Amino acid sequence: MDSNTITSFQDILQRMSKMQLESSSVDLNGMITQFERLKIYRDSLGESVMRMGDLHSLQSRNATWREELSQKFEEIRWLIAECRNILTKTENSFERITFLQALQLLLEVESEIRTFSFQLI
């Protein structure tokens, strides 16, 4: 993962952790947790692609990796929908900037995970 993406994840997570949205903090904490898991998944998938010989070990270690991949795309779509939902409701500029950047990052990560997964297939 390039340093800009790492910084973006860290920055967004840090800013989200300081927010109190009008919706429940449980929803925001859930989003933060999913962002963190998505970052870890994206990193591990990227490392597997870099080692390229890991395709067989990845498949043998986890025969359901395609199902996991599908689940991650579902999580990304949910996070995108949540970011868009928050953007339509909030007028707070700090929140708008944070969730616009989160949305952009999610779209970039989705594209990267698709690229990695096609390389592994």
Curated annotation (Swiss-Prot):
Keyword annotations for this protein, in alphabetical order, are: Host nucleus, Host-virus interaction, Transport, Virion
Disulfide linkage: none
The short sequence motif called Nuclear export signal sits at 12-21, 85-94
- Keyword Endoplasmic reticulum among UniProt keywords: no
InterPro entries (UniProt xref): Flu_NS2
- Membrane-crossing segments per the record: none
GO cellular component, as recorded: host cell nucleus; virion component
Asked if the record carries the keyword Transport, the reply is yes
This protein's source sits in the domain of life called: Viruses
Q: How does it assemble?
A: Interacts with protein M1. May interact with host nucleoporin RAB/HRB and exportin XPO1/CRM1.
So what family is this one in? Belongs to the influenza viruses NEP family.
**Functional description taken from the UniProt entry:** Mediates the nuclear export of encapsidated genomic RNAs (ribonucleoproteins, RNPs). Acts as an adapter between viral RNPs complexes and the nuclear export machinery of the cell. Possesses no intrinsic RNA-binding activity, but includes a C-terminal M1-binding domain. This domain is believed to allow recognition of RNPs bound to the protein M1.
List other remarks. Answer: Average number present in a viral particle is estimated to be 130-200 molecules.
Please report the name of this protein according to its UniProt entry.
Answer: Nuclear export protein
* Source lineage: Viruses, Riboviria, Orthornavirae, Negarnaviricota, Polyploviricotina
